[in-house]
Amino acid sequence: MCRKYVDEIRHQGVNVVVTGKWENFVTVSCNDSTLIDRIAALPFVCATEKVWIAPKGDSPMMSTGRDSLINQPSVHPDSIYGLAVSQIQMSNGDKLHQGGFKGQGMTIAVIDAGFHNADKITAMQNIRVLGTKDFVNQQADIFAESSHGMMVLSCIGMNQPGIMTGTAPEASFWLLRSEDEYSEHLVEQDYWSAAVEFADSVGVDVLNTSLGYYTFDDKSKDYRFRDLDGRHALMSRQASHVADKGMVLVCSAGNSGMGSWKKITPPGDAENVLTVGAIDKEAVLAPFSSIGNTADHRIKPDVVAVGLGADVIRTDGNQGKANGTSFSSPIMCGMVTCLWQACPELTAKEVIELVRRSGDRKDYPDNIYGYGVPDMWKAYQDYLLKR
């Protein structure tokens, strides 16, 4: 991003909210629409688009209260994974752990809506959190906002044998907030794009994003099926850069399978990302799991993992169940991280392809299961054979 251009835009009297280098955009806020007309007339500005409108008379919304803590999770001594054992065993991620690959030396960014009580829950205190950043509201407390990201984090990072062990328990984490749970506007894709670039700047290896968009408060912005080509939505274009930057992006397919939309949601339509659908613990498709393919006929979702009755940590510090591709994605993300740790010579795109090729439906992929349930141990063995 050319600093001179950003400064000239700022000098028009607007506040710069975020910038994006990869897609060459600047997001600004102002109270006077004529300022946008002046910016649009600048010789280096290609186009402008309204991505957010402030609620009348309201200050930015943020959470201040916290859910009460119990912090008395049950212990299940039969497995270090606790009740979450089946959601990692289904893809043989536990065999990677037994081989010594638990995410050591790898960094994961979780881009989500908030991480409620993750800083207070006793069972999560040994998760290696390197830092946090809020792209929605710098004055907000990321640990007081939505519980969604906290439950997502628990699927990957929990490291309490007998209570719950996640799919990459020894990885390190950046917790980034890009989703504003109080509204649905295009600006959240701007926040997300900035979060992805920040993750790249701090050395992240793998990203999980259990977010997706197709409908907005401004209905004129809603997506149509033809928009699912990996190029229409800003998130999808940004996501398509991630592997070229040396990171693997794992994202949720969406939960629209039972509604009128049914399809995956951006950024899940992007190229060179792993889009994850949801199954139950018997490997049967969750009815809500969004389906593909993309508008340009690429296979989506890529793979599936447990997302119906997934085991998570709740905001009270005890175990619970959750449904959604929001949880199949991080379960897969952690295993992908451990696989890449085991196969350090591979590029991001090669890791993604290795995971696809290990799926139990690799010979007949479809728009429901994609390439199926990956076998992470088989993927590792295939890597060793080809070295």
What are these regions (language model features)?
Residues Y5-I88, D94-H97, E271:
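Autoinhibitory propeptides
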Residues V16-K21, T165-T167, P365-D366:
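Short beta-strand
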Residues C30-N31, V51, V110-G114, C155-N159, ...:
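Active-site-proximal beta-strand/loop segments in catalytic clefts of secreted hydrolases
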Residues D58-T64, A118-M124, H185, K219-S220, ...:
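Short, solvent-exposed loop/turn and secondary-structure capping segments
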Residues V85, V202, V206-N208, Q341-R387:
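C-terminal subdomain of the subtilisin-like protease fold in secreted/lumenal serine endopeptidases
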Residues D94-K133, Q138-E188, V202-D205, D218, ...:
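Subtilisin-like serine protease catalytic core
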Residues H97, N159, L175-D269, A295-R298, ...:
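Substrate-binding/access-modulating region of protease and related hydrolase catalytic domains
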Residues D112, A123, T265-Q341, E345, ...:
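Extracellular S/T/G-rich loop segment that most often corresponds to the catalytic His/Ser-adjacent loop
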